[in-house]
């Protein structure tokens, strides 16, 4: 055999070995994340069902323990576990079209974020999102919210239901029953 044929055979064998290694690693990754994928699919099915059931419903006004200005209406009030992370949010065009914005981060090979969840009271009005963590208030305008996505949060190998709200230079990771909160924010942003 000529040296060209031997070289081609060697390259084909090396290519097939790399291909086999890639398939094995992909299979092991799929096995490792099987629970997450199943949990995430169930959670997104519940979210889609909730969206369809409440698509045409109006946001109902609720009373807060604090007095609101005349032009503000209380829409959501709940104590949730919230972790605040300072990270610059890049500007995309269609944040709200993508309910799966955080999925890539959750399926990462490495734990990239360490969450520090604290019980925090969250208030949503037609103009502001307010966080009360007993030490101080954080007040964000609804227009400052860049995205609000339902997601499964993977924290120290525990799978939790929640959402991620991205604001200018901050990311809020929220655990708990947040379907009404996310739906209200999307309706206020006129994205739903």
Each language-model region and where it sits:
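Terminal and domain-flanking low-complexity segments
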Residues: 4, 35-58, 128, 176-192
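N-terminal signal-anchor transmembrane alpha helix of single-pass membrane proteins
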Residues: 1-38
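Conserved beta-hairpin
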Residues: 111-137
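Residue-level marker of intrinsically disordered, low-complexity segments enriched
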Residues: 6, 10-12, 60, 66, ...
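Short beta-strand element of the conserved SAM-dependent methyltransferase core
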Residues: 79-83, 124, 165-167, 174
């Amino acid at each position: 055999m000529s040296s060209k044929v031997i070289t081609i055979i060697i390259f084909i064998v090396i290519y097939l070995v790399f291909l086999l290694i890639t398939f094995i690693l992909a299979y092991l990754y799929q096995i490792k994340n099987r629970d997450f994928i199943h949990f995430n699919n169930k959670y997104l099915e519940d979210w889609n069902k909730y969206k369809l059931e409440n698509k045409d419903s109006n946001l109902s006004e609720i009373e807060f323990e604090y007095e609101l200005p005349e032009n503000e209406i209380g829409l959501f009030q709940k104590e949730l576990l919230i972790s605040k992370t300072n990270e610059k949010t890049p500007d995309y065009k269609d944040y709200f079209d993508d309910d799966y914005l955080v999925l890539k981060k959750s399926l990462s090979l490495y734990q990239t974020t360490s969450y520090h969840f604290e019980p925090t009271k969250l208030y949503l009005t037609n103009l502001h999102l307010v966080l009360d963590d007993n030490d101080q208030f954080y007040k964000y305008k609804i227009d400052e919210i860049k995205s609000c996505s339902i997601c499964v949060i993977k924290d120290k190998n525990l799978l939790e239901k929640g959402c991620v709200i991205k604001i200018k230079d901050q990311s809020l990771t929220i655990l708990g029953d947040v379907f009404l909160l996310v739906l209200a924010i999307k309706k206020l942003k006129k994205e739903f």
